[in-house]
Amino acid sequence: MDNGHGYEEFELLEDGSLGECSTQVANATFLTISKLICLVVAFKFIKHIPISTTVRVYVHVFASTFTVMWFSRNHLQSAIIYNMFSLISLALAIKQFSGYIILAGNISLLIALQNFCRHYRSEDYFLSIRGILMIHIMRLTTVAFNLEKANSNKFRFVQFSSYVEYIYFPPFIIFGPYLSFEQFFKMRDKKWTGSENELGFIIQSLLAIFNAITLAIISSCHFEFFEPSSQFMEDALTAMSFRFSHYFVCLSTQAFVLMLGSDVVVANPLNIEFSRSTLQTVSEWNKPFHTFLHENIFKRRLFNSTACNVFFTFAVSSLLHGLDFQMTITLLALGFIAYSETVFRKRLSARYSMCVAAKACPVRSNSLSCKHRHSNKTGRALIINLFFLMLSMYHLVFTGMTFTDDYSAIGYPFDHAWKIWGSHYYSSFMISFLFLALSKII
Amino acid sequence: MIPRRSCWLILLLNLLNVQSLLDASWWSTVAQLSTALAGHNVKPVCELPGLSPGQAQVCELFKDHMPAVSIGAQNAIQECQRQFTGHRWNCSTHYSTGMLGPIHKMATREAAFTYAILSAGVTHEIGRRCKQGLLTSCGCSDETKPKNVPTDWSWGGCGDNVEYGYKFSRDFIDIREKEHDPKRNHDNGRSLMNRRNNEAGRKILKRHRKPKCKCHGVSGACNMKTCWMQLPSMEQVGKILRNKYDKAIRVQINDRGNLQLLADEATKERKTRALPTDLVFMDDSPDYCRFDRHSGTLGTEGRVCKRGSGGAEGCDSLCCGRGYNTYTQEVKSKCNCKFEWCCKVVCQTCNNVTQVDICK
């Protein structure tokens, strides 16, 4: 008798056959980038088409609104929120309100929206739209500061349409990058330079996109390639995953600006991975973001004290994320680490006349080396700089390992960062305090 | 503690019953495959006595899979022991036979749990190694199927790695239950039960795959997510199966030779249909209190228990009312470590006295 004959076969509930992690991530990222590339190509041609200013403004506004709807989960809601920020800011700007007031108003609106989402248990929706609103607020603030300088008597529709076109530029809405006013209009007014040059830009863009997707795959699927053998390695992989996700966004947007004819640099991953100092890491992390903070916040010198202006800059940088404790404390940590390292290295450089400051020594035109006795090429300075390079790598791990995947879509708990930093005994902070102490001694 | 004279008697009796033990302990054979591999430093030996003829054939055909099967089985046994730590039945090995893994002579709940978690463990490990590209016939292999492989077998193709692990586990493990092995009696009911529980373990693994996502966006935002399916860990599988174990369903063989649900005596409610992931059993469990050669139970004598605890690990429950003996145990450890200049660390040796309660 066949024993298998009597076995009661249960129906197999087949899940859909799923590809592996790398395949799925590659498909997902390419699909998203493809949509954005369509926008880039469309607006590359639109900017060369001779259409009237009024029509151009309407095209930009409607295309931007549909872009926000296209990439968001709650379509109408996102469109309303996006345009609400614009209308309020433009109205205030035209009425000659200060750029600071408009920035504060936008941040208040952002925090109000966050609290609203929190109240209705939709924190994941806020996080999905926060990136779009952050860049939007940056552009609105830039317009506000520009309008401060404008003479109200000479305000015309042409100038207003320029601001609207700058704010409502579809290719840069979802992932950015932020471009300053001058950078944007330099890009917009760039003439067609011939097929050879355009082909070169396209090849550079495709290369950047390829690198971006590769980094996105490594960011999501690193467990397929490498299994951590220790807790430190796992933390390092988490931090690497967070950084590579950031590089994916930066390189994608870099490709977009290249296609559109701009030479703005968004971020160079190599300059961050092998950074001379944490100060360089902070400024290289997102150059357009750094440009916005430096030109619109820091250089305007709201306060007399440099320390107050630095703190204010970090405060604005933090509040552009809404009330995000994790981001706030990470930015403050980075600020503290960068500050203590800069102070210590400046002291070290002056005391021993070595080229080991946080910023590379400027090379004077009349000589091949800097003013210090021990230049970059001497062994002693090289060893010290190498030590600080390794330290910067560790700081990257320390500040990035708190961005684990489990809470990234819904917001991190209050004590998440402290618990993870505690497992490393707050070592980056200890090193920073040590540097501050040593800078007083030597 | 069993007197020394009884050990010889037990050993002798075990030799007489080695034929029946082999059938119940074939998982021990599977778990030993990597031991054979490590010991001889050659390909796994496919002539181990616990393998059925069909399994030996699969072993020869898929030699590179056998370390994964072995490790999967070992992981499953570890998880089983973790789930039942402190219980009377704790998935432990029969100490006198030197075999690895539990032995089940009766068709109990514990047997159901064991078969399910072992099947899940093998599926899990095969799937994991598939993903890492460590198995030759996984992935997009263009190799044609050998002729001596039965036609209804699944041949590795371009399927999902979990799907591959699922199919391989089904073919390798269930083939034993379908064969007419002259070494064993024709227990159709037990065979059907084993196949059912094996399938339950595999299905639980498949059904509890969850999407795992990573956020991408501007400055830590979540504009975009990339997601992929992820297997549950063996801990999660053990937890789920433990739940299924508590709610296992009693079945019997009907006239047509199929498994049939029995009315639940406790609630008098008759289930019309069992879920595909439910565990099934046919025999009542013994109390696992005494060593019993016939039922294959080890007993709780000599087990460490917790005095005053009301749970399963408590002395009253674990020792089955026989009481316990308290022993003092000296544990030496380093303490009061100090740094001596320069440059070494000097520690004192402390003797910590703890009490251990052991069932009579």
Swiss-Prot record, chain A:
Record's keyword terms, sorted: Acyltransferase, Developmental protein, Membrane, Segmentation polarity protein, Transferase, Transmembrane, Transmembrane helix, Wnt signaling pathway
Molecular function terms, GO-annotated: palmitoleoyltransferase activity; Wnt-protein binding
Catalytic residues as annotated in Swiss-Prot or TrEMBL: 321
Family matches, as InterPro entries: LPLAT_7/PORCN-like, MBOAT_fam
A GO cellular component entry from the record: endoplasmic reticulum membrane
Catalytic reaction list: [Wnt protein]-L-serine + (9Z)-hexadecenoyl-CoA = [Wnt protein]-O-(9Z)-hexadecenoyl-L-serine + CoA
Enzymatic class: transferase
This enzyme's EC code(s): 2.3.1.250
GO BP: asymmetric protein localization involved in cell fate determination; embryo development ending in birth or egg hatching; embryonic digestive tract morphogenesis; embryonic morphogenesis; endodermal cell fate specification; left/right axis specification; lipid modification; protein lipidation
Compartmental location: Membrane
Keyword Iron: no
Transmembrane segments: 26-46, 51-71, 84-104, 125-145, 157-177, 199-219, 247-267, 319-339, 381-401, 418-438
Assigned protein family: Belongs to the membrane-bound acyltransferase family. Porcupine subfamily.
Family matches, as PANTHER family: PORCUPINE, PROTEIN-SERINE O-PALMITOLEOYLTRANSFERASE PORCUPINE
Function: Key regulator of the Wnt signaling pathway that mediates lipid modification of Wnt proteins. Acts as a protein-serine O-palmitoleoyltransferase that catalyzes the attachment of palmitoleate, a 16-carbon monounsaturated fatty acid (C16:1(9Z)), to Wnt proteins. Serine palmitoleoylation of WNT proteins is required for efficient binding to frizzled receptors. Has a role in cell specification, specifically in blastomere signaling. Involved in cytosketetal polarity. Required for the orientation of mitotic spindle axis.
Name used for this protein in its record: Protein-serine O-palmitoleoyltransferase porcupine
Biological source species: Caenorhabditis elegans
Lineage summary: Eukaryota, Metazoa, Ecdysozoa, Nematoda, Chromadorea
Gene: mom-1
From Swiss-Prot, chain B:
Gene3D superfamilies given in the database record: 3.30.2460.20
Post-translation changes: Palmitoleoylation is required for efficient binding to frizzled receptors. Depalmitoleoylation leads to Wnt signaling pathway inhibition.
Single annotated GO MF: frizzled binding
Keyword Acetylation on entry: no
Annotated S-S bridges: 80-91, 130-138, 140-158, 213-227, 215-222, 289-320, 305-315, 319-359, 335-350, 337-347, 342-343
Residues with glycosylation annotation: 90, 352
Knocked-out gene: effects: Anterior displacement of the nerve ring in L1 stage mutant animals. Defective ALM, BDU, CAN and QR neuroblast migration and irregular CP and CAN axon growth and guidance. Double knockout with cfz-2 results in enhanced CAN migration defects, but the same QR neuroblast migration defects as the single cfz-2 knockout alone. Double knockout with cwn-1 results in ALM, CAN and HSN migration defects. Triple knockout with cwn-1 and cfz-2 results in enhanced neuronal cell migratory defects.
Family: Belongs to the Wnt family.
Protein name (record): Protein Wnt-2
Source organism of the structure: Caenorhabditis elegans
Gene: cwn-2
